[in-house]
Structures are given as structure tokens and as C-alpha cells.
């Protein structure tokens, strides 16, 4: 086994199996990870461990049937969620780590954030501090299929559309994947799929790895000159190769990580007519999003590329019409009120939700520095003495979080 050096850039491939599919309300059952070097060579033994659910939670039987991990098994072989989170935190916080999985941006990373939030670890720093970052092999596969599909066998689902299920891809490409929905097996399979892309399309792999961080993505965005870019996302659907050409038009006034763009594959005339009035109704805003307004979160590792990646030989396959796209851009430029109204509409659109359940409120703001000091005290306190801690928190979420933290992890104390 190669001795891992913290200064060496590396990948940490990881996966959860869970007792349900809701990333905030459902609980983890198993965590597994394998560390590789930058060339995807395994440099450490796999790590895996289990977490038993707290007494206030009922697992989803359907998930148990899929994973074959029962609550009884985790009770016997696992730990409470606090100790489970501590182990994961220590692994993820090793410097120069690119944390990567298969659909991790939408699922596994959200599980990580929520278990850290519930157990008084910072929910975010693991993905950026000490040179760390994150990436998603599923999104890389979507980009490969849309932009450079040669060399990989692409399976079809029952509807005749390309399937991006990990088990389908491994089967079609003769990759060993013995036990799907076992976290260790899924991690090995993800590494092999990543190796396949790197081998068959090395330039694509290296390009998207290089621009995975938002500071690199910013360089692709040119609002002043109305430069369109390619955006790869499941949002557009497999029938459209999970791809569109978008025109960035503005930054969200309330969140600098959100880019407002227009989907140029949509009917732009209709969208412009919709925005002749300013309306803040939630149904109207949903209609705008359905009609071509795109809110793109640069801190969620979106797959973006310059329009030049589309070669002429790709036009027919992708139903890509550059002349039509240019006409739509000119139409937007002639209707500058449209951009201003879009900015106003979304500047007033406050998406902060009041769930009245602290487990769902991770995104209702950051904790201030005083609360962070109190959080550190809680985490460093022996469970026996937690009942003696009386914190006057600034953030109203923390009182309920602290109560649940004690009840779920240290009930006997």
C-alpha cells in the first residue's frame, strides 16, 4: 500500500447507503470510501462502517429491501450518528482531497452536509478548506455522452433512452460490479467508470476536472459580450442529451453563487413577452423557470463548457443550430428590459422556507462566530456533562438542534 501524503493531491471516492431517499430527514446506514492518487490508482485500503438510526426515526422498508442493511444489523455493527459523523469528518478533512462519487452532488454530499449539521460539525468546510474540492462522476458521464461519446458503451433503459444507472453502465462496459447498492462495491465501480472515461476521453476528463471549482467556472462567463456556453445537466433530460446552450445574463442579487441564464433551446419570444410585466407570484416564477430561465449554482460543480466544444460533426446528433441560437441572442440584446425585469423578479424571490422542523433548516443561513464557539464547546464536551451546558444561542435553530443531538446520540446521559 502506498503511504498517503497529505500534500499529495488525491481523490476520495465515497458512497452512502441510507434508510431512505430524503437527504435531510432520512438517516445513513453505511459509509464507504477509497482514496486514490490523481491518476486513479488506489493508494489506501477501503474504509467502511455503519450507523444505527436513532429511536425517533422509522426506516423506509423499501430502502432496506434494496440495500439489505437492516436497523438490527447496524445496531450490532455500527455507531450512533455523532461517532459516525466524526469518523467521516476526519476522513474528508485531509488536505488536498477531491471528494467524488456517483450522483454525490445531489445526494451523498447532501447527506454529508446534513449529518454534520445535526451533529455540530461544519457542514461545508470539508469541500473547500485546505485545498479540498468536490466533483461528480455522474455529471462527467453525462458530459462525455453529450460531447465525446466515442469509446464507451451507452446502455438503454426500457424507454429506449440512455441509462446512467451505475449498474447499467458497469454491465454494458464489462466492469465488475458484484453487489450493487453495497457502498464498498459501488465505490469500486465508480473508480472503474472514472478510469474508463479517463482512458477513452482523457482530454474531456482533464478539462472538466480542471474547471470543477467555481473560481475556474467564473472564467467561462462573459456577461458583457453575451457569450453563450454549454451546460450539461439532467434538468434538460436524456432526450436532449442532458444538454443545452445557455446565455448568462446576470448574477443573482441576493446570492453571488447563482448565475441567471436563458436556455437558448427554448422559445425566447414567448419568454420575453412573459417578462413585459413584473410579477413576484410563485406560480409565475415557476412558469419562467419552465419556459427557459435557468438558475445555475456555481458552488454545486455544474458542468459548463465553451460553445466551441460542439464540433460541426456533432450538430446533427445534438440537433444543434448555431444560426438559430445567434438569432435568439440578438433578440435578447434588442430587448434589454427583459434582462432588467428578470433581475428584479428574482431579486425579490426569497426562497428561504419555514419548515418548522430544524432538521430541514440547514440552508436557512450560516451560524455566526459566537454561535460557532458554542458549537465547538458542545462538540468537545463529554456526553456525561452535556446536560450542564446552557447556551444562549443567537440562532434559534441551535436550541432545537442541541436537544435532538443529546436525545438521539446520548439518551442515557
Swiss-Prot record:
Site residues by UniProt (Interaction with single-stranded DNA): 113, 124, 128, 142, 214, 257, 299, 363, 366
CC cofactor note: Binds 2 Mg(2+) ions per monomer.
Domain ExoI C-terminal: 350-413
Residues with site note (Important for interaction with ssb): 148
Binding site for Mg(2+) 2: 17, 186
Disulfide bonding pattern of the chain: none
GO terms, biological process: DNA catabolic process; DNA repair
Keywords: DNA damage, DNA repair, DNA-binding, Exonuclease, Hydrolase, Magnesium, Metal-binding, Nuclease
Residues the UniProt record annotates as site (Important for activity): 181
InterPro entries in alphabetical order: EXOI_C (IPR034748), EXOI_SH3 (IPR034747), EXOI_SH3_sf (IPR038649), Exonuc_1_C (IPR013620), Exonuclease_RNaseT/DNA_pol3 (IPR013520), Oligoribonuclease (IPR022894), RNaseH-like_sf (IPR012337), RNaseH_sf (IPR036397)
Protein residues bound to substrate: 17
Catalytic reactions of this protein: Exonucleolytic cleavage in the 3'- to 5'-direction to yield nucleoside 5'-phosphates
The protein's enzyme class: hydrolase
UniProt key word Hydrolase: yes
Segments forming domain Exonuclease: 12-193
EC id: 3.1.11.1
Keyword Magnesium among UniProt keywords: yes
Coiled coil: none
Entry note about domains: The N-terminal exonuclease domain and the exonuclease C-terminal domain form a central positively charged groove which binds the DNA.
Subunit description: Monomer. Interacts with ssb (via C-terminus); this interaction stimulates the exonuclease activity by recruiting the enzyme to its substrate.
Protein name (record): Exodeoxyribonuclease I
Organism of provenance: Buchnera aphidicola subsp. Acyrthosiphon pisum (strain APS) (Acyrthosiphon pisum symbiotic bacterium)
Amino acid at each position: 500500500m502506498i503511504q498517503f501524503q497529505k500534500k499529495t493531491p488525491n481523490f476520495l471516492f465515497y458512497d452512502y447507503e441510507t434508510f431512505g431517499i430524503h437527504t435531510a430527514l432520512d438517516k445513513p446506514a453505511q459509509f464507504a470510501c477509497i482514496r486514490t492518487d490523481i491518476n486513479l490508482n488506489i493508494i489506501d485500503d477501503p474504509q467502511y462502517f455503519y450507523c444505527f438510526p436513532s429511536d425517533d426515526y422509522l426506516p423506509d422498508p423499501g430502502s432496506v429491501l434494496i440495500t439489505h442493511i437492516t436497523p438490527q444489523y447496524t445496531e450490532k455493527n455500527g455507531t450512533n450518528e455523532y461517532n459516525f459523523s466524526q469518523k467521516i469528518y476526519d476522513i474528508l478533512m485531509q488536505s488536498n482531497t477531491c471528494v467524488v462519487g456517483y450522483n454525490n452532488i445531489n445526494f451523498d454530499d447532501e447527506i454529508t452536509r446534513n449529518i454534520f449539521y445535526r451533529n455540530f460539525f461544519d457542514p461545508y468546510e470539508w469541500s473547500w478548506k485546505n485545498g479540498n474540492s468536490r466533483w461528480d462522476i455522474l455529471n462527467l458521464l453525462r458530459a462525455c455522452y453529450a460531447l465525446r461519446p466515442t469509446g464507451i458503451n451507452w446502455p438503454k433503459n426500457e424507454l429506449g433512452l440512455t441509462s446512467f444507472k451505475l449498474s447499467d453502465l458497469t454491465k454494458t462496459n464489462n466492469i465488475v460490479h458484484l453487489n450493487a447498492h453495497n457502498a464498498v462495491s459501488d465505490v469500486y465501480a465508480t473508480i472503474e467508470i472514472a478510469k474508463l472515461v479517463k482512458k477513452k476521453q482523457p482530454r474531456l476528463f482533464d478539462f472538466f476536472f480542471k474547471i470543477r471549482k467555481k473560481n475556474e467556472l467564473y472564467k467561462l462567463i462573459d456577461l458583457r459580450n453575451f457569450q453563450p456556453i454549454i451546460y450539461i445537466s439532467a434538468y434538460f433530460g436524456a432526450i436532449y442529451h442532458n444538454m443545452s446552450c445557455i446565455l448568462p445574463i446576470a448574477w443573482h442579487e441576493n446570492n453571488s453563487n447563482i448565475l441567471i441564464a436563458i436556455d437558448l433551446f427554448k422559445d425566447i419570444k414567448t419568454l420575453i413577452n412573459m417578462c413585459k410585466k413584473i410579477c413576484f407570484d410563485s406560480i409565475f416564477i415557476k412558469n419562467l423557470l419552465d419556459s427557459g430561465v435557468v438558475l445555475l449554482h456555481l458552488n454545486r460543480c455544474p458542468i459548463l463548457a465553451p460553445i466551441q466544444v460542439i464540433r460541426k460533426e456533432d450538430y446533427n446528433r445534438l440537433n444543434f443550430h448555431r444560426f438559430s441560437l445567434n438569432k435568439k441572442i440578438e433578440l435578447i440584446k434588442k430587448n434589454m428590459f427583459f434582462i432588467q425585469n428578470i433581475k428584479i423578479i428574482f431579486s425579490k424571490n426569497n426562497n428561504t422556507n419555514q419548515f418548522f422542523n430544524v432538521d430541514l433548516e440547514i440552508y436557512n443561513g450560516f451560524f455566526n462566530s459566537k454561535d460557532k464557539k458554542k458549537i465547538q464547546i458542545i462538540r468537545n464536551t463529554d456526553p456525561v456533562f452535556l446536560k450542564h451546558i446552557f447556551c444562549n444561542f443567537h440562532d434559534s435553530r441551535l436550541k432545537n438542534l442541541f436537544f435532538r443531538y443529546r436525545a438521539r446520540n446520548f439518551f442515557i446521559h
